[in-house]
């Protein structure tokens, strides 16, 4: 998946600093994609510290006023028109006036508190996709680890001839020995920029409500507990990881799904699978539909396109019904739970955010 615009600029700047590998050089079925053979094509391995630095530099160059350590509290409304927001920081409450507000909270917090209709997760099934605590390991003998994969390729778990997961042979062994008290049946190990570093996407915390602080607190603590258990299993069983070190867990729990705003257009999974590109598309994307946990805690689904090579996300998905001067960006745009499984990841949400910013600027400029 290659998306241009600001995403491309961010990636290029990270590469210049030695902190990323260009997605055109990264293919599926490789260590960078955990050997997954469906979806996960053209991903971008990067260093988190490099990304932080690049984003700060770009914001400074664009003369953006940034307020870290500041939390949205409630919208300022005049009828159905949003005129700004009340925020809170160590300095107390503050009112920020705005001609256009962009809700990039990931949970449609602004839209929801302004009165916009929202769907929570998958309403039909009464579930949301599970949360994950990413973590990073280093000091791995990658040649030894990759040799183990090569030796076990005939043991890959395949569905319709396609590999969806790896290292399940070691997970099964660990479970037999009482070292894996966990419902996942495989490991997601993704090679990083440096040869000895890997990112682990395996933990799974079900039923997390990303709009509730108690639920988020539980998820973060449970995620770290799971990361510790997974790391100990990796160190004990996976060849090349005998001397590995757990470098860091993510700064916050990884949320896949919460609210989906009701917008002027609702992106459906068939729009994606049929390669639909509406006239008002604000981006095109080729990412597969990636749904975790819909059929129980062990399930993973990858749905790829039936027609074409890419699909479009219409501008109407960013425009919530009933509320004026408000746009929504990120995973909480107007989309079904299944469709959101494709556009919730980093490159698409960056493109959606850029589109929302351009639309807001144009609306102000053109009155």
What are these regions (language model features)?
Residues 1-9, 15, 25, 46, ...:
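Flavin (FAD/FMN)-binding glycine-rich loop and adjacent Rossmann-like elements that form
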Residues 11-40:
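A conserved beta-strand/loop capping segment in the N-terminal third of enzymes
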Residues 36, 66, 75-77:
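Trp/Phe/Arg-rich N-terminal binding region typifying the photolyase-homology
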Residues 37-54:
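Short beta-strand to alpha-helix junction loop
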Residues 59-73:
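A conserved beta-strand/loop element that lines the FAD pocket in flavoprotein oxidoreductases
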Residues 77-83:
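A short, glycine/Asx- and small/polar-enriched loop/turn
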């Amino acid at each position: 998946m290659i998306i241009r615009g600001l995403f491309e600029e961010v990636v290029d700047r990270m590469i210049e600093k030695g902190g990323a590998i260009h997605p055109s050089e990264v293919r599926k079925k490789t260590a960078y994609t955990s050997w997954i053979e469906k979806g996960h094509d053209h991903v971008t391995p990067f260093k988190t510290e490099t990304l932080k630095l690049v984003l700060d530099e770009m914001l400074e160059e664009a003369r953006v006023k940034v307020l870290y350590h500041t939390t949205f509290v409630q919208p300022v409304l005049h009828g159905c028109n949003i005129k700004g927001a009340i925020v809170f920081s160590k300095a107390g409450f503050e009112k920020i006036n705005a001609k256009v507000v962009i809700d990039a909270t990931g949970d449609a917090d602004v839209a929801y508190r302004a009165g916009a209709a929202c769907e929570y997760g998958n309403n039909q099934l009464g579930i949301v996709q599970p949360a994950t605590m990413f973590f990073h390991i280093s000091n791995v003998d990658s040649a030894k680890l990759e040799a183990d994969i090569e030796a076990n390729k005939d043991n890959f778990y395949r569905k319709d001839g396609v590999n969806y997961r790896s290292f399940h042979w070691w997970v099964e062994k660990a479970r037999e020995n009482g070292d894996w008290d966990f419902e996942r049946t495989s490991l997601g190990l993704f090679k990083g920029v440096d040869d000895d570093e890997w990112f682990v996407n395996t933990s799974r915390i079900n039923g997390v409500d990303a709009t509730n602080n108690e639920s988020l607190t539980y998820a973060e603590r449970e995620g770290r507990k799971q990361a510790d258990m997974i790391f100990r299993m990796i160190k004990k069983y996976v060849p090349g990881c005998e001397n590995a070190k757990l470098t860091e867990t993510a700064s916050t729990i990884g949320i896949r799904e919460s609210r989906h705003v009701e917008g002027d257009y609702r992106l459906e999974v068939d729009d994606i699978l049929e390669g639909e590109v509406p006239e008002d598309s604000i981006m095109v994307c080729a990412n597969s539909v990636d749904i975790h946990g819909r059929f129980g805690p062990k399930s993973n689904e990858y749905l790829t396109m039936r027609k074409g090579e890419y699909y479009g996300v219409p501008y109407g998905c960013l425009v919530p019904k009933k509320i004026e001067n408000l746009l929504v960006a990120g995973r909480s745009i107007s989309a079904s739970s299944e469709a959101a499984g494709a556009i919730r990841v980093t490159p698409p949400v960056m493109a959606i955010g850029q589109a929302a910013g351009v639309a807001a600027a144009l609306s102000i400029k053109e009155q």
